[in-house]
């Protein structure tokens, strides 16, 4: 019985790590793996820190001609449009040192951050280590993988942009609901202040005012971005 269970577990692990026809070992609906990204400037980001925002991970390399074709589109049509709305766009360069990665970014004129993956260990969490780059992974605010691309197919790229926009709209609605809930709490505090003069709501009011202004700006930017899709 124990041998049967162990065999089943081993088979499950093998199936889970078997690449699909595009080389992916993860699929839509999976959780974002935990890993640490190092950047050419010496900074680090843990994948856990990405939660709470829509995230796009873009696997790339300077020797990849398809990446060079796709990345200016990502810069112009995703990063520059959505970076002030609440998206993480991070390139992950495999098998290359920091100086090459920095030169690469300048050559193709991208400003979103590019992390280092010198041994392709991060890449191998998502796809077969021996498969090619030019891959985008779209992750929602809860760390669920929502979309996967391979190479630079115009139809798939457009669908990816639509998925990103939809996720950002959902993120905006969640933030708006939070604001409504916080306003209700403020209202209750103001009511209590009639009996307890020690309760101060000034700081709360200021924070909610700034949040509302930020959300109004985000709504206008989302509306503008939708027209570009």
Which role fits each region the language model picked out?
Residues 2-13:
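Sec-dependent N-terminal signal peptides
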Residues 15-34, 51, 175, 190:
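N-proximal helix/coil linker or "cap" segments that precede and/or mark the start of modular domains
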Residues 79-120:
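Conserved segment of the thioredoxin-like fold in thiol-based oxidoreductases
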Residues 59-76:
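Conserved redox-active cysteine motifs that mediate thiol-disulfide chemistry
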Residues 56-57, 89:
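Hydrophobic beta-strand anchors of alpha/beta hydrolase catalytic cores
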Residues 108-111, 118-165:
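Thiol/disulfide oxidoreductase modules built on the thioredoxin-like
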Residues 34-55, 126:
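A short beta-strand-turn-helix
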Residues 32, 169-229:
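Non-globular targeting/processing and membrane-anchoring segments
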């Amino acid at each position: 019985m124990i041998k049967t269970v162990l065999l089943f577990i081993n088979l499950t692990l093998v199936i889970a790590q078997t690449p699909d026809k595009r080389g992916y070992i993860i699929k839509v609906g999976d959780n974002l793996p935990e890993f640490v990204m190092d950047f050419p400037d010496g900074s680090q980001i843990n994948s856990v820190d990405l939660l709470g925002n829509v995230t796009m991970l873009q696997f790339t390399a300077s020797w990849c001609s398809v990446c060079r074709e796709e990345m200016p589109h990502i810069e112009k049509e995703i990063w520059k449009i959505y970076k002030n709305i609440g998206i993480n766009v991070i390139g992950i360069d495999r098998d290359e040192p920091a100086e090459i990665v920095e030169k690469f970014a300048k050559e193709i004129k991208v400003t979103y951050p590019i992390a280092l993956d010198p041994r392709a260990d991060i890449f191998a969490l998502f796809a077969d280590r021996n498969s090619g780059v030019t891959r985008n992974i779209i992750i929602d605010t809860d760390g669920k993988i929502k979309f996967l691309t391979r190479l630079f197919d115009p139809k798939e790229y457009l669908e990816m942009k639509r998925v990103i926009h939809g996720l950002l709209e959902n993120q905006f609605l969640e933030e708006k609901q939070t604001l409504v809930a916080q306003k209700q709490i403020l209202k209750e505090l103001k009511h209590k202040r009639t009996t307890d003069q020690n309760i101060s709501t000034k700081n709360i009011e200021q924070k909610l005012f700034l949040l509302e202004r930020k959300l109004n700006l985000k709504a206008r930017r989302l509306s503008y971005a939708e027209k570009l899709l």
